[in-house]
Regions:
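Membrane-anchoring alpha-helices and their flanking helix-loop junctions
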Residues: 1-82, 95-233
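Conserved SAM-binding loop
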Residues: 85-86
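Conserved beta-strand->loop/alpha-helix structural units within folded catalytic cores of enzymes
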Residues: 90-94
């Protein structure tokens, strides 16, 4: 059952998951010291999640799976952050989901959207594990036996970061939409806490415009072929 749901969500998550994020902005935000503290703490957690995704994508030998919106893998990636956690990208996503929830402190998001996110990613992970076990068999079993599913094994992480080259170009090409989304959500959440007059909203609007402009610029460079991820070694 979870595998079936996971395969469905793997195809449709880009359309469905953003709808859940809308619950972050339901209701009215009360400005208080507690709200500011929650915003700062939540932003830190969300940015940690984004940093996890950036490290995952930027380290050499790491290629994200998926073909034609179906679970797919050419090879079993066991290096980079995947040597410490089987699902570092999803770990990053979950940290971002938690961080947004802490920052917003919104009961609609915390009570409805966040549990749905957790269930959705549990199903997607189940679908991917089912596929990888069928494709790679014992190799995947051994990988699972020594590598945690989500909570990373920190032993040896420093050596991994030192010995693997980091590809910033790949990060920009592969991660710009997620980074743009993270910045937009945090700007909007901060606006609900800090904005009190037209000048504040003008500043927020300018930050949103610049973020979208940067995202559009990267997209155009990518589509034109002037910006690419470079070779995977």
């Amino acid at each position: 059952m979870m595998v079936t749901i996971g395969n469905f969500l793997f195809r449709t998550r880009n359309a469905l998951f953003p709808l859940l994020y809308l619950t972050l902005f339901l209701g009215q935000q009360r400005v208080s010291e507690a709200a500011v503290a929650m915003l700062v703490a939540g932003a830190a957690i969300a940015l940690l999640g984004q940093a996890t995704r950036i490290l995952t994508v930027g380290l050499d030998y790491i290629v994200r799976g998926g073909r034609q919106r179906k679970v797919y893998a050419d090879s079993l990636v066991q290096t980079g952050l995947f040597a410490h956690c089987r699902n570092p990208l999803y770990l990053g996503n979950l940290l971002m989901i938690i961080g947004f929830g802490v920052a917003a402190n919104n009961p609609w998001y915390l009570g409805i959207a966040m549990p749905l996110f957790f269930f959705g990613y549990a199903c997607i992970i189940a679908a991917e594990e089912h596929y990888l076990l069928g494709r790679f068999g014992e190799s995947y079993r051994h990988y699972c036996a020594r590598t945690p599913r989500l909570l990373p094994r920190l032993a040896g992480l420093g050596e991994t970061l030192r010995t693997f080259a980091f590809n910033w170009r790949r990060v920009v090409v592969k991660e710009y939409t997620t980074l743009c989304m993270t910045l937009l959500v945090l700007i909007l959440l901060a606006s609900r806490v800090f904005n009190t007059d037209a000048a504040d909203w003008l500043l927020s609007g300018a930050l949103i415009f610049l973020t979208l402009l940067a995202c559009l610029a990267v997209r155009m460079l990518k589509k034109s072929g002037r910006l690419n991820a470079g070779p995977v070694r």
